[in-house]
């Protein structure tokens, strides 16, 4: 079974990246098992390999990290749950198909949102999970991955209760029309992060 590793405090992006890469190397050389890291980050803007400089509007003294994942700019911070699976798509009956893997990550989020009667959707020609509300379409989760020798790293970020104002420092995912939301904003109440993490763990093992 894939090892589930939960970090109990917001960590720097660079620390999480080192953990992912170390686990990936261990899987490749046979010294480590597959793992999922679930955590929150300290405030950071991350830029994927497709990010453009003019998509960073105002960093608000928030650190900026350029990464090797797919995608453009996004924000990570406390109140946003991050899932970083480091798993082998060539093993355990999985499919060596990146699009299928990204779709499975979206399904994980969509299934978890059902516990709160929130209907998550995917949108053609975009990556991530969205919701349709009376105020229009809003993004609730971002997905950005990289695959090395069919081993995955990076992953998905789900807005539970982050400071949504901090998304205004970037053009999220390169789309000026993107409006972000969170579970707490949609419910107009706080949910317990540990409860939500337990849901994600349950739903992850159903898919992967």
Curated annotation (Swiss-Prot):
Reaction(s) catalysed (UniProt annotation): octanoyl-[ACP] + L-lysyl-[protein] = N(6)-octanoyl-L-lysyl-[protein] + holo-[ACP] + H(+)
This protein's pathway: Protein modification; protein lipoylation via endogenous pathway; protein N(6)-(lipoyl)lysine from octanoyl-[acyl-carrier-protein]: step 1/2
Entry keyword Lipid biosynthesis: no
UniProt GO cellular component terms: cytoplasm
Positions contributing to substrate binding: 69-76, 142-144, 155-157
InterPro entries reported in the protein's UniProt record: aa-tRNA-synth_II/BPL/LPL, BPL_LPL_catalytic, Octanoyltransferase, Octanoyltransferase_CS
Coiled-coil region list: none
Keywords: Acyltransferase, Cytoplasm, Transferase
One Gene Ontology term of the molecular function aspect: lipoyl(octanoyl) transferase activity
Cross-referenced SUPFAM superfamilies: Class II aaRS and biotin synthetases
Domain of life: Bacteria
Entry annotated with the keyword Repeat: no
Domain BPL/LPL catalytic residues, every copy: 30-208
Positions annotated as active site in the UniProt record: 173 (acyl-thioester intermediate)
Bridged cysteine pairs (disulfide): none
E.C. numbers: 2.3.1.181
Site feature: Lowers pKa of active site Cys: 139
GO terms (BP aspect): protein modification process
Cellular localization per UniProt: Cytoplasm
Pfam families: LplA-B_cat
Function per UniProt: Catalyzes the transfer of endogenously produced octanoic acid from octanoyl-acyl-carrier-protein onto the lipoyl domains of lipoate-dependent enzymes. Lipoyl-ACP can also act as a substrate although octanoyl-ACP is likely to be the physiological substrate.
PANTHER family: LIPOYLTRANSFERASE 2, MITOCHONDRIAL-RELATED, OCTANOYLTRANSFERASE
Other comment: In the reaction, the free carboxyl group of octanoic acid is attached via an amide linkage to the epsilon-amino group of a specific lysine residue of lipoyl domains of lipoate-dependent enzymes.
Family stated for the protein in its record: Belongs to the LipB family.
Protein name: Octanoyltransferase
Annotated source species: Orientia tsutsugamushi (strain Boryong)
Taxonomy of the source species: Bacteria, Pseudomonadati, Pseudomonadota, Alphaproteobacteria, Rickettsiales
Gene: lipB
